[in-house]
Amino acid sequence: MGGGGQLTEPGEQGSGRAGGVYTWEEVQSHSSRNDQWLVIDRKVYNITQWAKRHPGGIRVISHCCGEDATDAFAAFHPDQRYVRKFMKPLLLGELTPSEPSQDHDKNAALMEDFRDLRKRLESQGLFRTSPLFFILYLGHILLLEALSVALLWNFGNGWIISLLLSVLLATSQAQAGWLQHDFGHLSVFKNSTWDHLMHKFIIGHLKGASANWWNHRHFQHHAKPNIVSKDPDVNMLNILVLGNILPVEYGIKKVKHMPYNHQHRYFFLVGPPLLLPLYFNLHVIQTMYLQRDWVDFAWFLSYYARFFMFYSPYYGILGSLVLITFVRFLESHWFVWVTQMNHIPMDIDHDKHDDWLSMQLKATCNIEHSQFNDWFSGHLNFQIEHHLFPMMPRHNYSRASPQVRELCEKYGIQYQVKGLWESWCDIVRSLKKSGELWLDAYLHK
């Protein structure tokens, strides 16, 4: 789920009766690693063998097995009619007429209203892109890159100039990070092929990372946000314990990789400074090597070739490596505080099989709308709208927001909006609370 593209070869068959009828109990019994069914629009599909070739990755689609994946399917696939052609060989049948369309006793009215909201937003043109927005956005990133080189050409590599160009490069890298995010979600072009190509250019050539690595992690996060064992962004046991449930579970099991009761303090040392220059950088290289992803590796190398071409004449090879590391160090602070402010303070739990709207609202919150916040966060201050509609161009989030809030109010679902500083403080408060829960369970349970 996620990524679109050709899904299966003609003639590949799902096992079972193509015209069969099934109950939810039967579907839910096929949710193991080696036996996977799912439901989309009441049709039952066997994805067991094919999941390995899913364009969005095996894990993201496997996370939805045994349940209704209709809303996830709509969220991740821009051309559903095209994709459905390749799903036909996987079709087993349909739910029995007596079965509801929703699983796990989900609120049918809420789900129907959410789907109506999506159709209404589509009819309002909120899934249509403004080309000028993205042209100007890419332009300001390239301008920052050009200014940093121009500083060197005209003023040399003194300390003040080096610090100034480091800030310019960190800003361009952070903004390129938000832009690759847009292309990765297929939210810019009508033809997803161009999104994929631009994604590789932005994340590979402009940032020195891997598109496939990012997709594999990020689609899982979107499909099951803040859900243990399914969202890789909350799998931090070796460093942090998050939420209210996991700290108690780990404390009872006497798991102690770190003094978690102090995590709100050491977070400032191991989180914002090191995530990009150390963990992500090494993980990108490891993933490309293990997956033999030579295309992304070529894009990755093109970034470093360009960087050394411009900067090694002034800093040398070693000095250029120091410069890259310092730029990533600066960018990492920006990235961590922005990406975690919407999620760490929210619910983190095992999968409760909630409907799409409820699941996303439990795991996300918004930050106040302003021109600065929009630019600074790459419009991730509208995290709720982004998670509900990941293919919506971000310049339309502010128009969708009032309608999403109205639907949430109708069903008593909390729609949280915070100030920027408040959201950052909530990260630290949440880490402190989780650490205290772990310590209490570790010592007394």
UniProtKB/Swiss-Prot annotation:
<comment type="pathway">
    <text>Lipid metabolism; polyunsaturated fatty acid biosynthesis.</text>
</comment>
<feature type="short sequence motif" description="Histidine box-2">
    <location>
        <begin position="218"/>
        <end position="222"/>
    </location>
</feature>
<feature type="transmembrane region" description="Helical">
    <location>
        <begin position="159"/>
        <end position="179"/>
    </location>
</feature>
<keyword id="KW-0256">Endoplasmic reticulum</keyword>
<keyword id="KW-0443">Lipid metabolism</keyword>
<keyword id="KW-0444">Lipid biosynthesis</keyword>
<dbReference type="InterPro" id="IPR012171">
    <property type="entry name" value="Fatty_acid_desaturase"/>
</dbReference>
<keyword id="KW-1133">Transmembrane helix</keyword>
<protein>
    <recommendedName>
        <fullName>Fatty acid desaturase 2</fullName>
        <ecNumber>1.14.19.3</ecNumber>
    </recommendedName>
</protein>
<dbReference type="Pfam" id="PF00173">
    <property type="entry name" value="Cyt-b5"/>
</dbReference>
<keyword id="KW-0812">Transmembrane</keyword>
<feature type="transmembrane region" description="Helical">
    <location>
        <begin position="307"/>
        <end position="327"/>
    </location>
</feature>
<keyword id="KW-0275">Fatty acid biosynthesis</keyword>
<dbReference type="Pfam" id="PF00487">
    <property type="entry name" value="FA_desaturase"/>
</dbReference>
<feature type="domain" description="Cytochrome b5 heme-binding">
    <location>
        <begin position="19"/>
        <end position="96"/>
    </location>
</feature>
<dbReference type="InterPro" id="IPR005804">
    <property type="entry name" value="FA_desaturase_dom"/>
</dbReference>
<feature type="topological domain" description="Cytoplasmic">
    <location>
        <begin position="180"/>
        <end position="265"/>
    </location>
</feature>
<keyword id="KW-0472">Membrane</keyword>
<keyword id="KW-0560">Oxidoreductase</keyword>
<keyword id="KW-0276">Fatty acid metabolism</keyword>
<comment type="function">
    <text>Component of a lipid metabolic pathway that catalyzes biosynthesis of highly unsaturated fatty acids (HUFA) from precursor essential polyunsaturated fatty acids (PUFA) linoleic acid (LA) (18:2n-6) and alpha-linolenic acid (ALA) (18:3n-3). Catalyzes the first and rate limiting step in this pathway which is the desaturation of LA (18:2n-6) and ALA (18:3n-3) into gamma-linoleic acid (GLA) (18:3n-6) and stearidonic acid (18:4n-3) respectively and other desaturation steps. Highly unsaturated fatty acids (HUFA) play pivotal roles in many biological functions.</text>
</comment>
<dbReference type="InterPro" id="IPR036400">
    <property type="entry name" value="Cyt_B5-like_heme/steroid_sf"/>
</dbReference>
<feature type="topological domain" description="Lumenal">
    <location>
        <begin position="153"/>
        <end position="158"/>
    </location>
</feature>
<keyword id="KW-0249">Electron transport</keyword>
<dbReference type="InterPro" id="IPR001199">
    <property type="entry name" value="Cyt_B5-like_heme/steroid-bd"/>
</dbReference>
<feature type="topological domain" description="Cytoplasmic">
    <location>
        <begin position="328"/>
        <end position="445"/>
    </location>
</feature>
<dbReference type="GO" id="GO:0006636">
    <property type="term" value="P:unsaturated fatty acid biosynthetic process"/>
</dbReference>
<dbReference type="GO" id="GO:0005789">
    <property type="term" value="C:endoplasmic reticulum membrane"/>
</dbReference>
<feature type="short sequence motif" description="Histidine box-1">
    <location>
        <begin position="181"/>
        <end position="185"/>
    </location>
</feature>
<dbReference type="GO" id="GO:0016213">
    <property type="term" value="F:acyl-CoA 6-desaturase activity"/>
</dbReference>
<comment type="similarity">
    <text>Belongs to the fatty acid desaturase type 1 family.</text>
</comment>
<feature type="transmembrane region" description="Helical">
    <location>
        <begin position="132"/>
        <end position="152"/>
    </location>
</feature>
<feature type="topological domain" description="Lumenal">
    <location>
        <begin position="287"/>
        <end position="306"/>
    </location>
</feature>
<keyword id="KW-0813">Transport</keyword>
<feature type="short sequence motif" description="Histidine box-3">
    <location>
        <begin position="383"/>
        <end position="387"/>
    </location>
</feature>
<feature type="topological domain" description="Cytoplasmic">
    <location>
        <begin position="1"/>
        <end position="131"/>
    </location>
</feature>
<feature type="transmembrane region" description="Helical">
    <location>
        <begin position="266"/>
        <end position="286"/>
    </location>
</feature>
